[in-house]
Amino acid sequence: MDLKNGSLVTEFILLGFFGRWELQIFFFVTFSLIYGATVMGNILIMVTVTCRSTLHSPLYFLLGNLSFLDMCLSTATTPKMIIDLLTDHKTISVWGCVTQMFFMHFFGGAEMTLLIIMAFDRYVAICKPLHYRTIMSHKLLKGFAILSWIIGFLHSISQIVLTMNLPFCGHNVINNIFCDLPLVIKLACIETYTLELFVIADSGLLSFTCFILLLVSYIVILVSVPKKSSHGLSKALSTLSAHIIVVTLFFGPCIFIYVWPFSSLASNKTLAVFYTVITPLLNPSIYTLRNKKMQEAIRKLRFQYVSSAQNF
């Protein structure tokens, strides 16, 4: 970061959560348990999808990728946040802050794109079942996965490069639980209106566009299902309602933070917790662990592991 007015910013101070020491301990235990469950749940899904041949299908390939992105997104911010709950001086180096922002937007952008791809997969599976295997080929799936990572990278690097060149004059307090672009940009000692508009157009537009596309895809699926069977409609409603809950919890805070004008509202820590801590935990349970085929695969994998351990 640039030197300005004789003051070189080498670290930022994160205010984190306010409250008594007992409340900090409560948050520490709660977020530690949530993060542990998030990591274990997503690893379980990835291992099961990889090891069980019955799950080698387009849907579970995408779910495995989603689990990996969820785990990475949570890991980008949650461990540091948990550690800070036990310290009075909550600081992060400038480059640590930049790294945190890069990976958060990288994995977040990739996950948003992947959710669109998963909605397309569900549309093909429900509305064009006879052509599902032909359309969702292995080559297309690999291309989709690579595309989601490319979009996530471009989305993140385009904003981080501009932020890294900002001069900071000494004010280095961030009223949040982790580093995020809107709050870091506001600390710069130059006019950042153009950059703020760019962040709104980039992060805000990506979040809002993906959210609208997902809702439209769900509506199209529901409109198409009744032509086939009432049982199919009931099953689709059950599946999509759960998906909509997770999508809303993930995209809602993102849209509010990045589409809303840069103000104190952007520092709402509760919103930040939702899409970096809560949603990565909900995705395994709602998208995958409620799936009967996945549950059966996990049981068989556990039985196989126990049998191998006993024989050993």
From Swiss-Prot:
Where are glycans found on this sequence?
Answer: 5, 268
Instruction: Please report the record's description of how this protein sits within the membrane.
Output: Multi-pass membrane protein
| Disulfide bond sites | 97-189
Per the record, what ranges lie on the membrane's Extracellular side? 1-25, 80-100, 159-195, 259-269
Q: Which Pfam families does the record match to this protein?
A: 7tm_4
> What InterPro entries does UniProt report for this protein, alphabetically?
GPCR_Rhodpsn, GPCR_Rhodpsn_7TM, Olfact_rcpt, Olfactory_Receptors
Q: Where in the cell is it found?
A: Cell membrane
Query: A GO molecular function for this record?
Result: G protein-coupled receptor activity
Cytoplasmic membrane side? 50-57, 121-139, 220-235, 290-312
Q: Which controlled-vocabulary keywords does the entry list?
A: Cell membrane, Disulfide bond, G-protein coupled receptor, Glycoprotein, Membrane, Olfaction, Receptor, Sensory transduction, Transducer, Transmembrane, Transmembrane helix
Gene Ontology annotations for the cellular component aspect, listed alphabetically: plasma membrane
User: Source organism's superkingdom?
Assistant: Eukaryota
Residues crossing the lipid bilayer are 26-49, 58-79, 101-120, 140-158, 196-219, 236-258, 270-289
- Please report which protein family the annotation says this sequence is part of: Belongs to the G-protein coupled receptor 1 family.
Q: What does this protein do?
A: Odorant receptor.
Please state what the protein is called.
Olfactory receptor 4L1
